[in-house]
């Protein structure tokens, strides 16, 4: 009888702590074996999914409080009560709450939500200054002067852009912003359904313009979506201007949101048909001229290519725009 009475008092203390701090009880009802109810006085509504951000966050805060009271009472509290809040970005139905949740996490905490484990940190991506040591292209008359600082701000990387842990990756999108083929589809699949949900609110995007969203399950914090020109064959002057605008509009958003690193894919060179060599000239001119004005506001701009063909083009052309010797 004495033991049963002591257990009852301790359980009552835990229930009181959960009600004060909004914690769901470790059992569904007021006491084991009694009539069960679905929610506590201050907890989240019963209609909320267990994966819903509000439900998880409320549970996490309340559980911490219940655990603290349990320690003061000399009780070993139930392990699930002390678990941290977590949102499932694959199933949550509210992109706004998921976005707010992610913004409150540290970089280390965000890693738990990445779609991949083999992500690439920025510090692992060599700068052009380092890469150029292995480039044998000789440039008699470079288009621009040598600038050591700029050579440390630009990188050429061949690989999967969705795995780069940078502030933002740029998406070569179509005007609907709802996903498509190529890199666009890869980014949407990796980020998860919440990216498409947020993109639906942006109401399309014009050619040469850019819009920004959360990165969700990506290692990148943000995705900047831009729409390149469709140019099958020799591009016109207006199409070249639109391609340049894609990069500059994306960089404007980078500054606006105080982001310091970004990775760009090859925009318009896939199904949009822009010639790879001609695109590289536009891209390198835009990046060089932009960096000359804003080099202190960013840490790194990465040209991320997937095809060996594009890697060879940029390794050949970069010394003309970012000479190292």
Curated annotation (Swiss-Prot):
Gene transcribed to yield this protein: MACROD1
UniProt source species = Bos taurus
Modified positions (N6-acetyllysine) in chain numbering: 163
MF-aspect GO terms:
ADP-ribosylglutamate hydrolase activity; hydrolase activity, acting on glycosyl bonds; O-acetyl-ADP-ribose deacetylase activity
**What is the stated purpose of this protein?**
Removes ADP-ribose from aspartate and glutamate residues in proteins bearing a single ADP-ribose moiety. Inactive towards proteins bearing poly-ADP-ribose. Deacetylates O-acetyl-ADP ribose, a signaling molecule generated by the deacetylation of acetylated lysine residues in histones and other proteins. Plays a role in estrogen signaling. Binds to androgen receptor (AR) and amplifies the transactivation function of AR in response to androgen.
EC number from the UniProt entry: 3.1.1.106, 3.2.2.-
Q: InterPro entries annotated for this entry? A: Macro_dom (IPR002589), Macro_dom-like (IPR043472)
Does this UniProt record's set of keywords contain Nucleus?
yes
Where does the record say this protein resides? Nucleus
Modified positions (N6-succinyllysine) are 96, 103, 129
Name the chemical reaction catalysed here. 3''-O-acetyl-ADP-D-ribose + H2O = ADP-D-ribose + acetate + H(+); 2''-O-acetyl-ADP-D-ribose + H2O = ADP-D-ribose + acetate + H(+); 4-O-(ADP-D-ribosyl)-L-aspartyl-[protein] + H2O = L-aspartyl-[protein] + ADP-D-ribose + H(+); 5-O-(ADP-D-ribosyl)-L-glutamyl-[protein] + H2O = L-glutamyl-[protein] + ADP-D-ribose + H(+)
Crosslink Glycyl lysine isopeptide (Lys-Gly) (interchain with G-Cter in SUMO2): position given as: 138
**Region listing for Disordered, in residue ranges:** 21-55
* Keywords annotated in UniProt: Acetylation, Hydrolase, Isopeptide bond, Nucleus, Ubl conjugation
One record GO biological process:
peptidyl-glutamate ADP-deribosylation
Q: Does Hydrolase count among this protein's keywords?
A: yes
Activity regulation, in the record's words, is:
Subject to competitive inhibition by the product ADP-ribose.
Protein name (Swiss-Prot/TrEMBL): ADP-ribose glycohydrolase MACROD1
How does the annotation summarize its subunit structure?
Interacts with ESR1; Interacts in a manner that is estrogen independent but is enhanced by estrogen. Interacts (via macro domain) with AR.
Q: Which GO terms describe its cellular component?
A: nucleoplasm; nucleus
């Amino acid at each position: 009888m004495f033991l049963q009475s002591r257990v009852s008092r301790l359980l009552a203390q835990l229930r009181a702590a959960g009600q004060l701090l909004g914690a769901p009880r470790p059992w569904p009802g007021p006491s084991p074996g009694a009539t069960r109810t679905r929610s506590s006085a201050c907890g989240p509504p019963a209609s909320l999914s267990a994966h819903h951000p509000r439900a998880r966050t409320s549970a996490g805060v309340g559980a911490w409080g219940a655990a603290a009271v349990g320690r003061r009472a000399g009780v070993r509290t139930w392990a699930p009560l002390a678990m941290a809040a977590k949102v499932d970005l694959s199933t949550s139905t509210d992109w706004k709450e998921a976005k707010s949740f992610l913004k409150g996490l540290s970089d280390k905490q965000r890693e738990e939500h990445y779609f991949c484990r083999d992500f690439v940190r920025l510090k692992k991506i060599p700068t052009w200054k380092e890469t150029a040591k292995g480039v044998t292209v000789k440039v008699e008359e470079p288009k621009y002067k040598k600038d050591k600082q700029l050579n440390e701000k630009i990188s050429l990387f061949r690989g999967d852009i969705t795995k780069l842990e940078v502030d933002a990756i740029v998406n070569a999108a179509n005007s609907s912003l709802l996903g498509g083929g190529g890199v666009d589809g890869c980014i949407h699949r990796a980020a998860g359904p919440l990216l498409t949900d947020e993109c639906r609110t942006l109401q399309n995007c014009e050619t040469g313009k850019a819009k920004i969203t959360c990165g969700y399950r990506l290692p990148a914090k943000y995705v900047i979506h831009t729409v390149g020109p469709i140019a099958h064959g020799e591009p016109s002057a207006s199409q070249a201007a639109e391609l340049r605008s894609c990069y500059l509009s994306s960089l404007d958003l980078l500054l606006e949101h105080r982001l310091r690193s970004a990775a760009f894919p090859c925009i318009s060179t896939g199904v949009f048909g822009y010639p790879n060599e001609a695109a590289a000239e536009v891209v390198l001119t835009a990046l060089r001229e932009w960096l000359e004005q804003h080099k202190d506001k960013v840490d790194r701009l990465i040209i991320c290519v997937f095809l060996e063909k594009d890697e060879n083009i940029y390794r050949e052309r970069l010394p003309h725009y970012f000479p190292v010797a």
